Amino acid sequence: MNVFLLYPNRDAELKPVHLWHAPDLTEDLEMNFLFKAMALEDDFLFEVARVTIFSGLKNDFETIIYRQEIGKDCLKNSSVVRSIYDLSVELIESRKHSWYGIFTKYPSSVLSGSIGMIEVYLTILKKLRIITDENIGKFQSRGFGRFFSMIQTELTDEYFDEIQQHLDELRNRNGILISYELGKGNKSIDSKLLRLHNKKQNWFQKLFPPKSQYYSFDIHPRDESGAKALSQINDEGINLVANALAQSNDHILHFFTMLRKELAFYTGCLNLHEQLEEMKEPSCFPNPVASVERKYSFREMFAV
């Protein structure tokens, strides 16, 4: 999933801007005064505002108009935009306050931590889906239209049900089922973690299960080498799904990290607009023109 709220066809990089004239420009235009008004003492908002504005000096008409459309939506639906921004902060902070990733040496610990984080993330994803369903009709911009349509397409009820089912199976597993293929020298290769057969049975079937032909062996309680080998096989199987879950966690975290960064700029714009309203001063969305046209028209300019 992509955010695409600062650019119509890509996520914003928001890397540090190194302009040779940035210090002079900041001082001459008192840009820090603007950034502080947008940030309201939030260091993250301050930095995003600074980087976004300076990196936007070379934006084309399409990008400027695209952002203005989204900005107008933000002004009309400020509480909704702030709620989405708060969700992104909540998810990122939940990662910082979890035990996830501390015991990465042990696959079982990675799996347990990944399951816990996915469940936290699912709760926040469901909140985002609810906000989308309740407010999608209130937004008119191309940016938010694409964003909300993506949320409804990707985060369906079936998606949530399927993920929850997988998590329940992983958390309440009764042993593990792993398949192998035989390689050279009859060494096991291409391990795969399989889903356990979890057919519902009545009490009679549980007491007298149908017999099926299978081959098995038991390890002697004192066979330390055998127990160690079995433990390694167990960890290998768990590691397959643990890595997959960890990648899913990282994907969700990346999405909300980008969402926070891009909405931080619009949150700063909302902060600035609200302060101008308190001062009862006007604001507008200027019409951009090419620099070669040398058009410069304004009215009701004021000092703040």
Regions found by a protein language model. Name each.
Residues 1-181:
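Conserved amphipathic alpha-helical "coupling/scaffold" segments
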Residues 1-8, 14, 262-304:
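Conserved NTPase motor "head" modules and their coupling/switch loops across ABC/AAA+ ATPases, GTPases
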Residues 113-117, 237, 255, 259-262:
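Amphipathic alpha-helix face/heptad-repeat signature
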Residues 126-133, 168, 185, 189-198, ...:
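Charged/polar positions within long, soluble alpha-helices
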Residues 168-223:
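Structured, charged N-terminal subsegments at the starts of enzyme catalytic cores
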Residues 217-247, 253:
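Extended, charged coiled-coil "arm/hinge" scaffolds of SMC/Rad50-like chromosome-maintenance ATPases
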Residues 246-252, 256-263, 267, 271:
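Extended, charged alpha/beta regions that create polyanion-binding interfaces
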